[in-house]
Regions:
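Low-complexity, highly charged intrinsically disordered N-terminal segments
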Residues: 1-29, 37
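Generic, ordered loop/turn and secondary-structure boundary motif
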Residues: 1-3, 152, 222
Length: 222
């Protein structure tokens, strides 16, 4: 398999340029953070190349956390790195997420794909605070090759779920709303319709949660 490493940097720059143009045009006061998703290609030399472009990371399995620990040992990343934990949370994955927190990685955010994941997370959570995000379920296009709308919490359930299960917990802090469409970022009425729903949900959720400050836009470029 051949991998053209300069292409990685080109795509990172492309994303940053597009967001920076939009930020300037709309006078947006927030910031944009690029997170390289390790499941796209978890080869060591590929992630090394991505890190040269000052990226943060997104994991999808416990094996990815092993890689993060190796990169830290080699002083290629530090504990201020933003690490988003996505994907199905096996027991081993959850244990390693907690390990990173306990080692002092201060910007890790665990995305909950379902209400059940919170039940399993709480069994290993301990007393230290953990930053979390919630994945919003979407109304998937019927022709989608990979039906992923089973993942996430229905928009009309998220605020109730936060108020009932998260808000009063001293060891949980909601930081992020995660939005992902399997077809990726593309200019279509369907995509922008779902995106608008997510933004409206973020606004309503922010009114209930002061610590919410991040919107995770998942999906690659077409």
């Amino acid at each position: 398999r051949f991998i053209y490493l300069p292409k990685i940097g080109e795509q990172i720059k492309k994303a940053r340029n597009l967001f920076n143009k939009a930020i300037k045009y709309y006078n947006y006061k927030g910031s944009y953070q690029y997170c390289y998703c390790t499941k796209c290609n978890h080869f060591y030399h590929v992630i090394n190349e991505a890190l040269k472009h000052n990226v943060n990371l997104e994991t999808s399995s416990s094996f990815d956390i092993d890689l993060i620990l190796k990169l830290y040992q080699e002083k290629k990343i530090d504990k201020s790195l933003i690490v988003i934990h996505n994907g199905y949370k096996t027991e081993d994955y959850l244990q390693k997420i907690i390990l990173l927190r306990d080692l002092g990685f201060k910007n890790t955010i665990t995305i909950l794909d379902s209400t059940d994941e919170l039940n399993r997370l709480e069994k290993v959570l301990g007393r230290k605070k953990l930053q979390i995000g919630l994945r919003m379920a979407i109304d998937e296009e019927s022709q989608s090759a990979y039906y992923t709308s089973r993942l996430g919490i229905r928009p009309n359930e998220i605020i109730h779920f936060f108020n009932k299960r998260i808000k009063s917990k001293k060891n949980l802090e909601l930081k992020m709303l995660h939005f992902f469409v399997d077809s990726g970022i593309k200019d279509s009425l369907y995509y922008w319709g779902e995106f608008q729903k997510a933004l409206k949900l973020y606004i309503h959720l922010k009114k209930q949660c002061d610590t919410l400050d991040s919107f995770d836009l998942g999906g690659g470029f077409p």
